[in-house]
Amino acid sequence: MADDRVAGGATPPPPPPPPPLDASAFTHTPYYCEENVHLLCKELIRSGISDPAGTNLYAVFISNEEKKVPLWYQKASHSGDGFVLWDYHVICIQSRRKNGEVLDLVWDLDSSLPFPCSFIQYVSDAIRPLSFGNSTYRRLFRVIHAPVFLRSFASDRSHMKDHAGNWIQLPPKYESIVAEDGTTNNLNEYITMSMDDVKDLESMADDVYSSKHGVVINETILPEFFSRLPG
């Protein structure tokens, strides 16, 4: 029997996100989220979850001027709501479209939300936009197209050593990531961001595909920005 809502011209509900995957099957080193996302993008491409060139994937660095980034539903939290105040965090967003419907996914190996999680749910539950207004805790998002990120990002992990050269957090067991041009460390270029970096939506939707460091957007325009990207 036909659904009267659809037959009458009403818009059917969007399809649900794909069933959750086992996050433990992906490489994850605590406190090295930038490297986790680098390897995650590669694995999503290799496994066919993304398109072969990774053109529907985006690495997203979350930080602000004060390096105080509130997020919820984080596994590292000791509170019931999963609250953590990071200096920065990195996630992967996959742009998906079906019949004009925006069905974006968020891949966050450090989140207790479904893996992957629908973009709408992640924004609502983990980011909670407008929670802090114009305070120092408002989040900024540096969005880098995955093909550019995989070529350009590098980290020698020096940010995880104290002044005596001791590890603050143990590093991954694999070799550090070196950019295609031989750069060995540019992490700070990705996590440093300010409101002055935020430009108009139209130009950012174009620049994200060519800029080595992507584009910086604020939390109020985050959903609209991704709605403008192709799937």
UniProtKB/Swiss-Prot annotation:
Alphabetical keyword list: Hydrolase
EC primary class: hydrolase
GO molecular function, one term: protein-N-terminal glutamine amidohydrolase activity
EC number: 3.5.1.122
Entry GO CC: cytosol; nucleus
Catalytic residues in the record: C33, H89, D108
GO biological process terms, semicolon-separated: defense response to bacterium; positive regulation of camalexin biosynthetic process
Region of interest: Disordered: 1-21
Domain of life of the organism encoding this protein: Eukaryota
Compositional bias ranges of the Pro residues kind: 11-21
Catalysed reaction, written as an equation: N-terminal L-glutaminyl-[protein] + H2O = N-terminal L-glutamyl-[protein] + NH4(+)
Reported function: Mediates the side-chain deamidation of N-terminal glutamine residues to glutamate, an important step in N-end rule pathway of protein degradation. Conversion of the resulting N-terminal glutamine to glutamate renders the protein susceptible to arginylation, polyubiquitination and degradation as specified by the N-end rule. Does not act on substrates with internal or C-terminal glutamine and does not act on non-glutamine residues in any position.
Assigned protein family: Belongs to the NTAQ1 family.
PANTHER family: PROTEIN N-TERMINAL GLUTAMINE AMIDOHYDROLASE (PTHR13035:SF0)
Record note on quaternary structure: Monomer.
Name of the molecule in the record: Protein N-terminal glutamine amidohydrolase
Organism classification: Eukaryota, Viridiplantae, Streptophyta, Embryophyta, Tracheophyta
